Amino acid sequence: MSLIMFGRTLGEESVRYFERLKRRRDERFGTLESPTPCSTRQGSLGNATQIPFLNFAIDVTRRHQAVIPGIGTLHNCCEYIPLFSATARRAMFGAFLSSTGYNCTPNVVLKPWRYSVNANVSPELKKAVSSVQFYEYSPEEAAPHRNAYSGVMNTFRAFSLSDSFCQLSTFTQRFSYLVETSFESIEECGSHGKRAKVDVPIYGRYKGTLELFQKMILMHTTHFISSVLLGDHADRVDCFLRTVFNTPSVSDSVLEHFKQKSTVFLVPRRHGKTWFLVPLIALVMATFRGIKVGYTAHIRKATEPVFEGIKSRLEQWFGANYVDHVKGESITFSFTDGSYSTAVFASSHNTNGIRGQDFNLLFVDEANFIRPDAVQTIVGFLNQTNCKIIFVSSTNTGKASTSFLYNLRGSSDQLLNVVTYVCDDHMPRVLAHSDVTACSCYVLNKPVFITMDGAMRRTADLFMADSFVQEIVGGRKQNSGGVGFDRPLFTKTARERFILYRPSTVANCAILSSVLYVYVDPAFTSNTRASGTGVAIVGRYKSDWIIFGLEHFFLRALTGTSSSEIGRCVTQCLGHILALHPNTFTNVHVSIEGNSSQDSAVAISLAIAQQFAVLEKGNVLSSAPVLLFYHSIPPGCSVAYPFFLLQKQKTPAVDYFVKRFNSGNIIASQELVSLTVKLGVDPVEYLCKQLDNLTEVIKGGMGNLDTKTYTGKGTTGTMSDDLMVALIMSVYIGSSCIPDSVFMPIK
């Protein structure tokens, strides 16, 4: 008995002695990596974290040092070099991708991830790097670096062995093998199939592919689930998923876009939207324990095939013993540890099925056709912290009542994902020519299982006009007047320069031209929400056009003195400009638009001439220039009248103005005069709001000829463009396009 007690005491003393020796060594030389093999549950996943400490010296102060898992202590700038960080992530996470991960259900054999670290390094570079000799720290110098490295790797090891990460890595590997088997099986012995046209032989090639929008849906789903499961390890999860999806150059801001709580996908018809959601939902349920998925569509008949598809997939992969269901309403998948995941199905006609639920993912299929009251129920899930809503719908925009998702296109690019096969630069050509079906730059490619040619397009449009663009290509709705496409005209750089750069004309009168050009676009209305009178006064500043005055005038009431009031507005603005620039201008060329009313245009011209004469007689101006008016001869008449008829000059006038504006040749004076724009509003910014509404519409003409027009009324057709029209026409008339001989004084 005493021998047994002596042996036990000796053993305990020996253990304590060796522990003291180990602590002394660790304090002197740093912590050594544990050679203990991984447990069965860890599998090869744990081996990925058993990367030994590399003893190499760096000449960097401690404040600029950073410990990178799997490598060691380096300068912290290395973390921000895309090439280095991507390679480091590959070297670290390649072992995780080749492991079997957390096997939560039996009878599932996952195919190893094929990866080689040497694939990223050329043989020549590898040979050159191998010949480099690195200076090593002494044991005492290496101790703090070894301890820091061990601490980082221990944290990384705890992350890699967590149940949540095991589920995430298992999901990515299973989905990878789904693609390998064309979405038929997640087992190594699964049957082969290929989603392709039936008349195209596959020649033994069974590997499937993902469309870009399908990969985007997968990334949105995976990133959001990982942020919910592994919120404390968000940085490491992002690195892992960058490696999984092969997106090393994706920035952190873009990754946040994948984690947002709602996203919208507008995809053309027959492209595999619902077809892709079935295996995605099934695999999410079979991998993530406790997850709750919701699926809703516009009618019950649309939810039933999805319900049956998910149920059959789960039973095919894992057996019927793990799957329980309530016909057409819910599916429950059970795990071996007693946990389970659920999926709930409902149509927009019965939203009570999703009320009161606690979803992590809510898929809204054919969302453009969801009933309005159901939309309110769905949007209510945005208030849930751990729920993401994914709207998926076709690009049907034929009816305003079924296009509420497409109306989001101007609100946020991060929210809306529109799938199309024609880029914005080439969309006008596709819309103008009836045989074009794809983008001529080949940047956007159509799937192999889509038949898209000129004959198909003409056939589709024979059944219903514009059906090709709206239903098949996923483009924009055509204008009622013909084939059309609108796009902004002014560049962002030119617009910012126009707002910020305003030279002083008062201090630089010597370089100003001696001629002022005035254009008046009259409007006889007292409704401030309708069109008003636009007045623009411009001149030359060296080779540039400079704006001296802008007026947007609305009548207080419709009376017999309306023409006189408009004339007074123009005269007052002109008088202020002449007072600010004494002895500078010798001629003023005035153009009064007479398209709406020639009599009123003549009356405005007379009012301006009379009121300007009053200023001259009152000695208000130090020197009065000569006032000349544009004169037109109406058809069938031999007398010239002081008004300007705007006919086909508008398109070339806008072309000239846009070219000069984007070249920086249209500027505003620092002493710009505006008596009608509110004091709290900058007249230049007020003008820019109207310039932003100017769009070009390209229409298909006879044969292959395109015609273009311009509109400044905005998408609703109700925006004001009076000030913009006055400015554009004043610049155009002041150019050499119109001779000075048409300007004459009023006699």
Curated annotation (Swiss-Prot):
Pfam families: DNA_pack_C, DNA_pack_N. Its EC number is 3.1.-.-. The active site is at 366 (for atpase activity), 521 (for nuclease activity), 593 (for nuclease activity), 722 (for nuclease activity). A motif (Walker A motif) lies at residues 267-274. Keywords: DNA-binding, Host nucleus, Hydrolase, Viral genome packaging, Viral release from host cell. It is an enzyme of class 3 (hydrolase). Its main location: host cell. It is found in: Host nucleus. A motif (Walker B motif) lies at residues 361-366. GO terms for biological process: chromosome organization. A motif (Nuclear localization signal) lies at residues 194-198. The keyword DNA-binding applies. Component of the molecular motor that translocates viral genomic DNA in empty capsid during DNA packaging. Forms a tripartite terminase complex together with TRM1 and TRM2 in the host cytoplasm. Once the complex reaches the host nucleus, it interacts with the capsid portal vertex. This portal forms a ring in which genomic DNA is translocated into the capsid. TRM3 carries an RNase H-like nuclease activity that plays an important role for the cleavage of concatemeric viral DNA into unit length genomes. Belongs to the herpesviridae TRM3 protein family. HAMAP family: HSV_TRM3 (MF_04013). This is Tripartite terminase subunit 3. The gene is TRM3.
